[in-house]
């Protein structure tokens, strides 16, 4: 079994506020290209944490790829209460994260910032590699997870970058 953790920018961090935004198609095209490569290299589990934006788009692509690949999907939420205050439209996306092969949460509810560090460490310790849409120059809260991955020198990290998206756009 080879697992791939998938995470990255949230939609609002990319200035995407509608599902029909043209940026989403370009991002999904890049995701599909990359996920196929991971699948061809033997990845058979893709792990998500239930975030809107890059993760949700990757989940949509992964569900499409399940038709052609022996792929299993999992969502590991940081909290049981994850997404409970989201809008109705986003509740549908949350439901998609729950309609996978394996679903668990780490903590019943948020109590302290230390839980995020523990959750991130758990993800690194229990997955084989990560696929991350993040650039340190465009900093978000994802920087904490990114820095933990970098510190774990034996944990493979594959990044999608804005340059990659420009390449896909010009194809």
UniProtKB/Swiss-Prot annotation:
Record-linked SUPFAM superfamilies: MCP/YpsA-like
Signal peptide annotation: none
One Pfam family of this chain: YpsA
Name of the protein in its database record: UPF0398 protein STER_0279
InterPro entries, sorted: YspA
Entries under Gene3D superfamilies matching the protein: 3.40.50.450
NCBIfam families for this protein: PRK13660.1
Domain of life of the source: Bacteria
Family: Belongs to the UPF0398 family.
